Amino acid sequence: MPAIPPKLILASSSRYRRELLSRLRLPFTAISPDVDETPQPGEAPADLALRLSVAKAMAVAATHPGSVVIGSDQVATVDGDPIGKPGGFERAREQLRRLSGRAVEFHSAMAVTDGVHTETADIVTLCRFRTLTDAAIDAYLRAEEPYDTAGSAKAESLGIALMDSIRSDDPTAIIGLPLIALTRMLGRFGLDPLTGHPA
């Protein structure tokens, strides 16, 4: 008799991450983690993304023993400086003016845990922004309202029009959940999307 696969939980309130995970056709539940996302003094952007992804996964795993939990976080950087979520129109406009014509790194970190063992990954995406006029920025912000998105650019929707190019080993990383790496990680926890068996 085949073993029953563990319950899968996505520690996220993001509908985009839910949509991405659903592509793998594994049944899952989404639970919003309660985690303080304040950066630590001097913390590197990649370290911040990894720390928060682990914290989110562990926060949910602590109350759901026997489950496999996915935590994720994304941090954007320009010239090594982190670019957070803007929170409102004026800050988003400032961010996009700064990013106009520039190369931006997006660190898409993930943690997968069963509460005992934890695996992590950080997939880097390099985005080159078009040179943006104020009119283009304002039109985008009015249409998209990307105030809860690192760097104010939602590549999964109209934000793709802000880009000149995107380079990554995983095309889903820019949206916040790198499915190629995640598939490998889940297989090691007994959740292979193709076979249902450990990879």
UniProtKB/Swiss-Prot annotation:
The keyword Cytoplasm applies. One of its GO terms (biological process) is nucleotide metabolic process. It is found in: Cytoplasm. It comes from Bordetella parapertussis (strain 12822 / ATCC BAA-587 / NCTC 13253). NCBIfam families: maf. The active site is at 73 (proton acceptor). InterPro entries: ITPase-like_fam, Maf-like. This is 7-methyl-GTP pyrophosphatase. Keywords: Cytoplasm, Hydrolase, Nucleotide metabolism. It is an enzyme of class 3 (hydrolase).
